[in-house]
UniProtKB/Swiss-Prot annotation:
The lineage of its organism: Bacteria, Pseudomonadati, Pseudomonadota, Gammaproteobacteria, Enterobacterales. GO terms for molecular function: cytoskeletal motor activity; structural molecule activity. NCBIfam families: fliE. It holds the Pfam family FliE. Keywords: Bacterial flagellum. This is Flagellar hook-basal body complex protein FliE. It is found in: Bacterial flagellum basal body. GO terms for biological process: bacterial-type flagellum-dependent cell motility. PANTHER family: FLAGELLAR HOOK-BASAL BODY COMPLEX PROTEIN FLIE, PTHR34653. Belongs to the FliE family. It comes from the Bacteria. GO terms for cellular component: bacterial-type flagellum basal body. Disulfide bonds: none annotated.
């Protein structure tokens, strides 16, 4: 019967936890990148639609332009609020004494 060293098991568990934390942070970063891409896409779409409406091109109504502008505005406001929460959490963590 083979008895495995307790310290060896403990170290492997810690490495597994670090790997899980790394994967979670990568998922968070990927999510932020995707969200910022969507915000950029909304803003570009709103800009293009408003330019088409100003140039009186067919197929673009004022309703569509206003809806796209509001989507763009709301998504940007949400991004700013998320950024503020992240900065606030970072500052709170950095102000804690160890």
């Amino acid at each position: 019967m083979f008895i495995e060293n307790i310290n060896h098991q403990n170290i492997n568990t810690k490495f597994n936890l670090l790997d899980a934390q790394k994967k979670d942070s990568e998922n968070f970063i990927d999510y932020i990148k995707i969200a910022l891409g969507e915000i950029s896409k909304n803003q570009n779409h709103a800009k293009i639609d408003s330019e088409k409406f100003i140039l009186n091109q067919s197929g673009i109504s004022l309703n569509d332009v206003m809806i796209n502008l509001e989507k763009s505005s709301i998504s940007m406001q949400l991004a700013v609020q998320i950024r503020n929460k992240i900065v606030s959490a970072y500052q709170e963590i950095m102000s804690q004494q160890i």
